[in-house]
């Protein structure tokens, strides 16, 4: 009986692994219609009785401004072009900081944040961290870096019910994502650690200072030239949709 149970569990695990691989492969080309975080926020609103409208409009890579791409990289993951999903040095630094009793510090790369926002629930449990590592590895293996950043910018939370760059640009600045200035892009990146408490449209002194630091980091990283490092290197005959 125990043997049969283990066999069934093994088959179930193999099916779940196969489904996760197929899902990540599909989302390399298909825009995700929603994310796990969006579902979580909706459930949260039902439980609290506070209605919330989720706003999100997909914008393809070519319509997302370089300033926003660079602002997010400068703020969240400056080694994005170099790592394979995990910034080991940042993880070690965060663990050391947390062990010393400081405020909890994260070390999530953009790839890890995409995995978490798309597929997983919030929390710090070990099972969730294990699944995050699994999905991060799949994303890095199957998606080019441009796709990872494209999905991130279209899925990240930028306020209550505000998801993605287009909704954020309209909500905070009354404009479309393609028309964001470098200053506006840096403000959006500055609030990412706490987008439900901080406002890009009405920034505090701290947010303004952080945005100024982000603009400085953007210049030090080389501005839009940095983005050439995450451009897929394909031969001329390679289909554009791959």
Curated annotation (Swiss-Prot):
GO MF entry, a single one: pentosyltransferase activity
Record's bilayer topology term: Single-pass membrane protein
Pathway annotation from the record: Cell wall biogenesis; peptidoglycan biosynthesis
NCBIfam families assigned to the protein according to its UniProt record, in alphabetical order: mono_pep_trsgly
EC number(s) per entry: 2.4.99.28
Protein keywords: Cell inner membrane, Cell membrane, Cell shape, Cell wall biogenesis/degradation, Glycosyltransferase, Membrane, Peptidoglycan synthesis, Transferase, Transmembrane, Transmembrane helix
Cited SUPFAM superfamilies: Lysozyme-like (SSF53955)
Name of the protein in its database record: Biosynthetic peptidoglycan transglycosylase
Record family assignment: Belongs to the glycosyltransferase 51 family.
GO cellular component: peptidoglycan-based cell wall; plasma membrane
Locations listed in the record: Cell inner membrane
Membrane-spanning segments: 12-32
Example of a GO biological process term: cell wall organization
Pfam short name (any one): Transgly
Superkingdom of origin: Bacteria
Main location: membrane
Gene: mtgA
Purpose: Peptidoglycan polymerase that catalyzes glycan chain elongation from lipid-linked precursors.
Catalytic activity reported: [GlcNAc-(1->4)-Mur2Ac(oyl-L-Ala-gamma-D-Glu-L-Lys-D-Ala-D-Ala)](n)-di-trans,octa-cis-undecaprenyl diphosphate + beta-D-GlcNAc-(1->4)-Mur2Ac(oyl-L-Ala-gamma-D-Glu-L-Lys-D-Ala-D-Ala)-di-trans,octa-cis-undecaprenyl diphosphate = [GlcNAc-(1->4)-Mur2Ac(oyl-L-Ala-gamma-D-Glu-L-Lys-D-Ala-D-Ala)](n+1)-di-trans,octa-cis-undecaprenyl diphosphate + di-trans,octa-cis-undecaprenyl diphosphate + H(+)
């Amino acid at each position: 009986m125990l043997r049969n149970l283990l066999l069934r569990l093994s088959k179930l695990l193999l099916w779940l692994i196969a489904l996760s691989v197929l899902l990540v492969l599909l989302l390399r080309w298909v825009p995700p219609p929603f994310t796990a975080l969006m579902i979580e926020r909706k459930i949260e609103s039902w439980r609290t009785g506070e209605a919330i409208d989720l706003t999100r409009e997909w914008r393809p890579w070519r319509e997302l401004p370089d300033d926003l791409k660079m602002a997010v990289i400068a703020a969240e993951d400056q080694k994005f072009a170099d790592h394979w999903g995990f910034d080991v040095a940042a993880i070690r630094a965060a663990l050391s900081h947390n062990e010393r009793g400081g405020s909890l510090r994260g070390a999530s790369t953009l790839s890890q944040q995409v995995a978490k926002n798309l597929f997983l629930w919030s929390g710090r449990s070990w099972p969730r961290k294990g699944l995050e590592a699994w999905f991060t590895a799949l994303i890095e293996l199957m998606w080019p870096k441009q796709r990872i950043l494209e999905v991130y910018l279209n899925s990240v939370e930028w306020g209550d019910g505000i998801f993605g760059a287009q909704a954020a640009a309209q909500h905070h600045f009354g404009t479309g994502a393609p028309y964001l200035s470098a200053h506006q892009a840096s403000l959006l990146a500055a609030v990412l650690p706490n987008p439900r408490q901080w406002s890009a449209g009405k920034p505090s002194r701290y947010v303004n200072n952080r945005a100024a630091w982000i603009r400085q980091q953007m210049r030090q990283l080389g501005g839009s030239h940095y983005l050439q490092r995450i451009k897929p290197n394909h031969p001329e005959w390679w289909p554009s949709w791959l």
